[in-house]
């Protein structure tokens, strides 16, 4: 169960803080609801407390997970799918899971493609969305703000020569 003050992640909206827990009567049934403030979009999200995990709400990763996250951003297989539509859908679906490592994989794949052939406008938007979602969670894990989290993500990405990776994968 989540309590007021818990830092959580909603798979579609990013990371936030539980700001309120209250009982509400909906369709004649009294239920507990959580109000989650999502700073990324300044959204107040109301989620049934007993169904929060079922919709994918989870706790923010801990600082100890950041090293694994950095490894995911910098190493691993690169998907060479040539069909833009399939590649876009697969990346979008990975982002929708809300899984921090799936989002990091999307960022890695799009960073390589960006340094190779470049990104389409749709992929560029997806790349920016993935970085914002990841930063919304990294900020809580690192105890910083979103800008500092984005700087950390960009620093990790830039630590790898994606141009060399793209060239080796024949994406140049």
What residue ranges belong to the model's regions?
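A positional/architectural concept
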Residues: 1-57
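Charge/polar-rich, low-complexity and marginally structured segments
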Residues: 50, 55-172
